[in-house]
Amino acid sequence: EYTQYPEIDTVTFNFSEPKEISFTAMGREDPWAVVSKKGDPSSIEYTIPSPTAEELKAHCGGTVTGDKWEAPVSTPTIIKTIKLQSSPYNGKYTEYVFVKASIAGRLSQAPGKEETDLLLVKATIMTPVSAAGVRSAPYCREVKPVTAPVPPSES
């Protein structure tokens, strides 16, 4: 089950490049082997303009009473599955599902005369591991056709 946040602004992907480790023989310039190793953790970042109290709680922790959000006393651990959908283009859209992500949110812009406050969210992508110790893909990407909404049936 996903929570819909229709007002997410631009999303930034920070996919890390693999680090290469070269093995060379003494006196040789070219390596005899190159091994790729995962680099820094990959992450995505997005902003939510004028976040609600519930959106702040979901991304930063804390408590909500009515429309009032109170920041957490200590930094919480927030793990979520994230699904992103692009705007439609040529009858298709792209969907990304990040299976397990560590969420860290913060208010990054104060409200002003002509702008609203912004919630900046960084989601660090993690590899899911089952109870049996089996690792699975951390994310997937799929291009899907745009389908027309089904009108409600009349009785």
What function would you assign to each model-found segment?
Residues P18, P49-A53, S87-Y89, A101, ...:
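Generic structural motif
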Residues T65-K83, C140-S155:
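Short, cationic low-complexity segments
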Residues T94-S155:
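Mixed-charge, glycine-accented linear interaction segment located at domain edges/termini
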Residues E1-L56, K100-L118:
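Solvent-exposed edge beta-strands and adjacent loop segments
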Residues P49-P72:
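Charged, amphipathic alpha-helical segments
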Residues S43-T47, T81-K83, L120-T124:
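Beta-strand secondary-structure signal
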Residues W69-P111:
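Acidic, glycine-rich flexible loop segments
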